[in-house]
Amino acid sequence: MEVNIDLWCDDTSLLDDVGRYRRLVGKLIYLTVTRPDITFAVGVLSRFMHKPREVNWTAALKILAYIKSCPGKGLLYKKHGHTHISIFSDAGYTGDIGDRKSTSGFCTFIGGNLVTWRSKKQDVVSRSSAEAEYRAMTHIVCEMA
């Protein structure tokens, strides 16, 4: 997906075939099981399932073009001599220009292999980037407990 594209733009027309958009985004969601590199972009597009516009359809097609351009980017699990668990988190402060809510995410590695990941829009608006990061870290602790 392009940087700084306005997916919330009301200038473009609504799609005639909403079902086609929903089917494509649904298939992309299924594909995120093995392609974590598209998870965030697909998550953003899934926010427009109720009223997709032409700009959303174009962004979905660009994700398909990206997938086609780099076919070997899926998950590959390798045997390492250890089973250390590493967890990383991050939060994008006020990432959603529609409602200014932050997006937090995390990924878990066991033995150097990615096993879980998640990206989610936070439920409340954070007042600072530190608060958004703290919420992301708290979410991970609750998820792993």
Predicted regions and their residues:
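Divalent metal-binding acidic/histidine catalytic loops
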Residues: M1-A145
